[in-house]
């Protein structure tokens, strides 16, 4: 149930209405809008009322509201008028650009089943990004681009992001040459391809190579932390082995960062065992130990030779 909000706090009421729009609860938002419009003629409430009238079949009232807005010179928001026109059956077309969307615009586009343009993911609003990520009227790759950013901002769960990654479709040719294809296409789709490949790969060295590429791509995109949480369950199940010593440092870092310290110690132990004869192992040992110590100050593993 929606908690009542005093109308003298219009900003709070507006935030509540926007939140309802973002969770696809326009039916819950409209009663608040109809109440608010009695005390405020702010453009936000006028647009909201027109949307609610269109949703409830009050065609004539919605048209009148649009006409009044235009008479008052409030016709700068061309996207709004297109969205209203679509809901009223008076406009057919597509939204070419929506780089700075509002919660109302997203709700209207969803109600009218209008496809969201690719630039909609340029918004920096985490709540809007989360809404875009779960919008059925957005193409899968647009949803994924928004989902990566939303997870990074904390407004979308990691599991939801994994599910959106899994929804991306690929050709058999792309799947057969995942590493080279992912490098060519890069970005969210490339990462989705790498993740799909890693999850079905049963050769540990090949799986590690793909996971390393996934992390590298995410790092380049400023999404390393997000990527770490996405692949953590896979790494927890991966057994440290001598043939994977080149992967020990990266695997250990991800596991430490995501709180899987016990599994991270397995990679540290591997690096320690191989450090005498393999410089790469010694480097992994030296770099992982301070991270382990910070994560668990009571860890009894000796420091001998661990620090660079």
Model-flagged regions — what are they?
Residues 23-24, 56-57, 258:
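Structural motif corresponding to the intra-repeat A-B loop/turn of tetratricopeptide repeats
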Residues 15-22, 52-53, 254:
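Residue-level signature for tetratricopeptide repeat
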Residues 5-15, 39-48, 60-61, 75-82, ...:
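Generic helix N-cap/helix-start motif at coil->alpha-helix transitions
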Residues 28-123:
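Extended amphipathic alpha-helical segments with heptad-repeat/coiled-coil character used for oligomerization
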Residues 1-2, 20-30, 186, 218-230, ...:
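Helix-turn-helix repeat elements of alpha-solenoid scaffolds
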Residues 282-308:
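Small-residue-rich helix-loop
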């Amino acid at each position: 149930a929606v908690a009542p909000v005093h109308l003298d706090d219009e900003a709070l009421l507006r935030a509540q209405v926007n939140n309802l729009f973002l969770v696809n609860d326009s039916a819950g938002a409209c009663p608040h809008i109809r109440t608010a419009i009695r005390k405020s003629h702010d453009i936000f409430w006028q647009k909201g009322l027109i949307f609610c009238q269109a949703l409830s079949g009050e065609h004539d009232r919605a048209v009148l509201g649009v006409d009044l807005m235009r008479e008052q010179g409030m016709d700068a928001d061309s996207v709004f008028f297109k969205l209203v026109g679509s809901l009223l059956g008076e406009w057919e077309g597509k939204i070419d650009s929506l780089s700075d969307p509002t919660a109302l615009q997203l709700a209207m586009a969803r109600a009218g089943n209008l496809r969201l343009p690719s630039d909609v993911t340029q918004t920096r609003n985490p709540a809007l990004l989360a809404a875009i990520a779960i919008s059925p009227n957005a193409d899968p790759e647009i949803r994924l681009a928004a989902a990566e950013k939303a997870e990074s901002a904390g407004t979308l769960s990691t599991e939801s992001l994994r599910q959106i990654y899994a929804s991306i479709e690929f050709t058999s040719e792309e799947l057969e040459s995942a590493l080279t294809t992912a490098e060519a296409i890069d970005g969210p789709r490339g990462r989705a391809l790498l993740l799909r490949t890693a999850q079905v790969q049963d050769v540990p060295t090949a799986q590690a190579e793909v996971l390393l590429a996934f992390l590298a791509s995410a790092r380049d995109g400023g999404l390393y932390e997000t990527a770490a949480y996405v692949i953590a369950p896979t790494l927890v199940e991966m057994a440290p082995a001598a043939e994977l010593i080149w992967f020990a440092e990266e695997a250990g870092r991800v596991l430490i960062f995501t709180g899987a310290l016990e599994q991270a110690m397995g990679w540290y132990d591997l690096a320690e065992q191989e450090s005498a004869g393999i410089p790469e192992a010694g480097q992994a040992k030296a770099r992982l130990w301070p991270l382990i110590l910070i994560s668990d100050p009571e860890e009894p593993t000796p420091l001998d030779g661990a620090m660079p």
